[in-house]
Amino acid sequence: MIDIKFLRENPDVVKENIKKKFQDKKLPLVDEVIELDAKSRAAKQEADDLRAKRNQLSKQIGGLMKEGKKQEAEAVKAQVAEFAERLTELEEQEKTYAEQVTKDMMMIPNMIDPSVPIGPDDSCNVEIEKFGEPVVPDFEIPYHTDIMNRFDGIDLDAAGKVAGNGFYYLMGDIARLHSAVISYARDFMIDRGFTYCVPPFMIRSNVVTGVMSFEEMDAMMYKIEGEDLYLIGTSEHSMIGKFIDTINEEEKLPYTLTSYSPCFRKEKGAHGIEERGVYRIHQFEKQEMIVVCKPEESKMWYDKLWQNTVDLFRSMDIPVRTLECCSGDLADLKVKSCDVEAWSPRQKKYFEVGSCSNLSDAQARRLKIRVKGADGTKYFAHTLNNTVVAPPRMLIAFLENNLNEDGSVNIPTVLQPYMGGKTKLTPKH
């Protein structure tokens, strides 16, 4: 959510930003906000003036009564009563206008960074850099579930009976590999100075609307029936929510947290659920990282965050690349975002395994996450988030890039301590 003062002073700039995000249907919101905001402020000003007059008249009543001027005092009382009725009307008007302004403001996208490429969708995302040499072996790479089945490592049929499409059972060495990756990612981030956190796996609606747009909320979140609770789609939401309604001392920033959590997503929309596999599913596990920092430091932290993911994947011998997300591919609260993609030898192309985002003060403004400077000045913090690793997708990249012709899978050195010292996984059939 952008600063309403900025919108008042720069309506054309805000409209141009909406156009750059190819959301022209939202253009009328800018004029509506300006109109309603003016009405809200006018109602407030009139109410403030009336209160001042009411207070002045109220003081006269006591004096008139002492002077025995009861009739004049009663006349003043009647005038004060009229003010009270009008004040109630004005307060209700101000509240109604302000609530609609807030709703409209939450629909207006954040101002994108000038460096963001302009384009309507992810087909216009721009490659930034490649890390590691993509390799295509001279033997056929099976589909990832077929590789897992060689180790008796996945059961989609049983999961379908228990929970429906979009769920899975991981078994044996594949399940152990899944846990090993999470444990390694946790220690990797702790070694980089992040504080490990196990957050709530459910959040209230005020946190949901504070961290994401309504469109994202509708497409992702599962609501608990009869409760003001949602299952998290990613732990960044509950980690950022930790700072709701806080004033943080400037010298204590930045806060850098990393967390493990299960994640639950409806995956409603264009992509939907994958029929057979673990690429796009309703439930998965993820190691996440977030930063709450001073505004002038958010660009620096943005580069550090995505580099963490690149370094993690490269340490497991997986080639990756980074893509700059174009304007139309950015969620409404994001100022700038890049995807980290891993190489798929089977498909001979890269696929998304993580996303890094700078949200500037959008989440902080909604959640009232403020910073108190050394001089006592208060301002909104900046928030960022990034995927460390999401094992279901990472397992696809891992198995394909470490598969041998005989069906065995090499275990990179960094994971061996988490796999009981194993250097290789041998298929059962």
Q: Model-predicted segments: where are they?
A:
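TRNA-recognition modules of translation machinery and tRNA-sensing kinases, especially anticodon-binding
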Residues: L27, K130-H429
